[in-house]
Amino acid sequence: MKDILNALYHQKDLNDEEVKKLFTLIIDEKVSPAQLGAVLCALKIKGESFKEISVAATTLLEHAPKPFNSGLDLIDNCGTGGDGLKTINISTIAALIASSMGLSMAKHGSRSVSSHSGSADLLENLGVNIEMNPMQLENCFKQSHFGFLFAPLYHQSFKKSAPLRKELFTKTIFNCLGPLINPLRPKIQLLGVYDKSLCKTMALALKALGVKRAMVVNGGGTDEIVLHDITHACELKNNEILEYDLSAKDFDLPPYDLKELQIENAKESVQACLDILENKGKDSHTMVVAANVASLLYLSHRAKDLKEGVSMTLEHLKTKAPYAHLQKIIRLSHA
């Protein structure tokens, strides 16, 4: 541990062996709170490399139980969170809609730290059992194309280090790791990051982890694709990373103000979700969610481009099938 800290104090990247050793010690609770705080801050100041992030994720995955084998190319749209803008839960609503369209969504997530409602909070408030056992999860997934993996159930190191990380008053490597350690190891990911500078780093980390197809995005300072500002994207395609910007025009949608997406409390988040699924949501809410679903359809080769993905999503919402689909997920999660 001393050598690892010394390397970080001298602004040196850790090699693979050092990262694996460090995170094994963290998992085994052999790192003191003072040492963990020092490591996280030193990594933050140095700047985490994509290799450090990917090896840390691999180590955490090696120690996480895998609930079941699906045999499918699974999709996740878990983001880092941490943008602090308190918007509706775009990614979770998008995952529910995408699964109602037949995409195999293995949604990894946790409770909110900086927003009114994280993915776990929203689903729980909707009535979904967020702590499904492996049998329930597999059954729910097979019958609905949707499964929620509550991160603290699979990664105790996240749960146990949470109080210390909160006291640091800064984002750490743990924020980056959250979207990378889904125990079902999805091969397709739409990953939102809280800072534009992380897009390329996280895309490289996904590539190193063996993800086949991905898009890492930051839209106007949020960890989502947005319509009120430019969304910066790094797309992993054919083992190459393409970097570009997206605007509302790329989705054939009008722009909307960020304020229209912001909510005051968790209750508003639930109502926004239900309204969208029943095709009676505010245009600003429905359209930004449609843009995110479109990206999932595009990454999954279900839509030839983003505009077609939006058109498919909006037509599907007219049927109100996503609302009935949510009721099915709620029922299956408690079965």
UniProtKB/Swiss-Prot annotation:
Entry binding sites for Mg(2+) 1: 91, 224
Cofactor(s) the protein requires to work: Mg(2+)
Binding site for Mg(2+) 2: 223-224
UniProt keyword list: Amino-acid biosynthesis, Aromatic amino acid biosynthesis, Glycosyltransferase, Magnesium, Metal-binding, Transferase, Tryptophan biosynthesis
One Gene Ontology term, aspect cellular component: cytosol
Entries under NCBIfam families matching the protein: trpD
Function field: Catalyzes the transfer of the phosphoribosyl group of 5-phosphorylribose-1-pyrophosphate (PRPP) to anthranilate to yield N-(5'-phosphoribosyl)-anthranilate (PRA).
Name the record gives this protein: Anthranilate phosphoribosyltransferase
Organism, scientific name: Helicobacter pylori (strain J99 / ATCC 700824) (Campylobacter pylori J99)
Gene: trpD
